[in-house]
């Protein structure tokens, strides 16, 4: 039995379940599959548990996503604009 995932079908994936093109709902839990020896398997489809899987290539560089635009409440100061002078008055002494 061959199962093919169709990316064109909307809402075909739920939690650990897929719906095939034929409308069959298939569970993807590990308990539903037999663990097989990879060395003895001939070029066929087989299931390998995640803890046994071997990564054959190093992950590529991770590119940073451009930052989100600043919030309306975040004010960015333009370095070309001079700062306004401080408007604080010195504290008054007791004699004044």
Swiss-Prot record:
Main location: virion
PTM summary: Myristoylation and palmitoylation (probably on one or more of the nearby cysteines at the N-terminus) enable membrane-binding and Golgi apparatus-specific targeting and are essential for efficient packaging. Phosphorylated. Phosphorylation does not seem to be required for recycling to the host Golgi apparatus. Packaging is selective for underphosphorylated forms.
Membrane topology category: Lipid-anchor
Gene Ontology CC annotations of this record: host cell Golgi membrane; host cell plasma membrane; membrane; viral tegument; virion membrane
Keyword annotations of the record: Host cell membrane, Host Golgi apparatus, Host membrane, Lipoprotein, Membrane, Myristate, Palmitate, Phosphoprotein, Virion, Virion tegument
Annotated Basic and acidic residues bias: 65-81
Family annotation (InterPro entries): Tegument_UL11_Herpesvir, UL11_simplexvirus
Modified positions (Phosphoserine) in chain numbering: 40
Asp/Glu-rich (acidic): annotated segments: 37-43
Disordered, as annotated region: 50-96
Location relative to the cell: Virion tegument; Virion membrane; Host cell membrane; Host Golgi apparatus membrane
N-myristoyl glycine lipid attachment residues: 2
Subunit annotation: Interacts with cytoplasmic envelopment protein 2; this interaction is essential for the proper localization of each protein to the assembly complex and thus for the production of infectious virus. Interacts with gE (via C-terminus). Interacts with gD (via C-terminus). Interacts with UL56.
UniProt similarity note: Belongs to the herpesviridae cytoplasmic envelopment protein 3 family.
Record function comment: Plays an important role in the cytoplasmic envelopment of tegument proteins and capsids during the assembly and egress processes. Also participates in viral entry at the fusion step probably by regulating the core fusion machinery.
Protein's UniProt name: Cytoplasmic envelopment protein 3
Record organism: Human herpesvirus 2 (strain HG52) (HHV-2)
């Amino acid at each position: 039995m061959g199962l093919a995932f169709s990316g064109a079908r909307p809402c075909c994936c739920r939690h650990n379940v897929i719906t095939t093109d034929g409308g069959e709902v298939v569970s993807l839990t590990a308990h539903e599959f037999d663990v097989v020896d990879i060395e003895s398997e001939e070029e066929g489809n087989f299931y390998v548990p995640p803890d046994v899987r071997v990564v054959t290539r190093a992950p590529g560089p991770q590119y940073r996503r451009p930052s989100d635009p600043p919030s309306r409440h975040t004010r960015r100061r333009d370095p070309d604009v001079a700062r306004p002078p401080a408007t604080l008055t010195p504290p008054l002494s007791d004699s004044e």
